[in-house]
A protein has these predicted regions:
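Ribokinase/PfkB-type carbohydrate-kinase core domain
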Residues: 1-128
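Conserved phosphate-binding/catalytic region of the ribokinase-like
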Residues: 62-65, 87, 92-196
Length: 196
C-alpha cells in the first residue's frame, strides 16, 4: 500500500511549469500526485513545445479522465482504465475494445498494464503487447512507477514503443522481486540481462 501525504506535491502550481525547460522531441512524464491543473499546464506546455507527454493516471481520481484526451500517451493499470472507460462512456465487449474506442475518440495512445499478464497498448497506428517476466512477487509497490519511468526513458533514448514497452514491462516485473518502492527499481543492466 502507498499512502500519499500531499505536502510539497500540493504546492506545485501551474505557474511553476513556466520555469521548466522543455524542448521539441523531449518526453514529459507526469502522474496525478500534483494538482490536476498543474498536470494540465505541463501537458499543454509539452504540446506547445513539440514534446511528447506521457500521463500516468496514478494515483487515479476522476480528474485524470479529462487529461487522458490531451496527453500523447496515457498509462493506466487495469482498474484505472476501467474506471476511466466508464467515466468516458467507452463501449466495447472487453478492455481491448474499450481501449480502441479511446483511441478512436481521442487519437491518442493508451497503454494498460496488466500485472502478471504484461501490458497492452492501442495506438492510432496499431496495437502492441509485451509480456511480464515470470517472477515470484515479493512486493508490487512501485511496479507501475518503475514501468512508467523505464517507458519514458526508453522512448527518450530512441526505442520504438513496442521495444520500450518490453523493457518497461521487464523492469516493472523485476521491481516486484524486492520490497519497497525506490529500493526495488532495477538497474538497466539487470533489466537487459533478464530480457536476454
Amino acid at each position: 500500500m502507498i499512502v500519499i501525504a500531499q505536502g510539497a506535491n500540493a504546492t506545485v502550481m501551474p505557474e511553476d511549469i513556466a520555469a521548466l525547460v522543455i524542448n521539441k522531441g523531449d518526453y514529459v512524464l507526469l502522474q496525478m500526485e500534483i494538482p490536476t491543473q498543474t498536470v494540465a499546464a505541463a501537458v499543454k506546455m509539452a504540446r506547445e513545445k513539440g514534446a511528447i507527454s506521457i500521463l500516468n493516471t496514478a494515483p487515479f481520481h476522476l480528474d485524470a479522465v479529462a487529461l487522458m484526451a490531451d496527453a500523447d500517451i496515457t498509462v493506466a493499470n487495469e482498474t484505472e482504465f476501467d474506471l476511466a472507460a466508464d467515466a468516458m462512456a467507452l463501449h466495447g465487449v472487453d478492455r481491448k475494445t474499450k481501449m480502441s474506442a479511446f483511441v478512436a475518440k481521442t487519437g491518442k495512445t493508451i497503454i494498460v498494464t496488466l500485472g502478471a499478464d504484461g501490458v497492452l497498448a492501442v495506438t492510432p497506428l496499431g496495437n502492441f503487447s509485451a509480456s511480464a517476466l515470470k517472477i515470484t512477487p515479493v512486493d508490487t509497490v512501485g511496479a507501475g512507477d518503475t514501468f512508467c519511468g523505464y517507458l519514458g526513458a526508453s522512448l527518450a533514448q530512441g526505442l520504438g514503443l513496442e521495444a520500450a514497452m518490453a523493457r518497461a514491462a521487464a523492469a516493472g516485473s523485476l521491481a516486484c522481486t524486492k520490497a519497497g518502492a525506490q529500493p526495488a527499481i532495477p538497474l538497466l543492466a539487470d533489466v537487459l540481462k533478464a530480457m536476454a
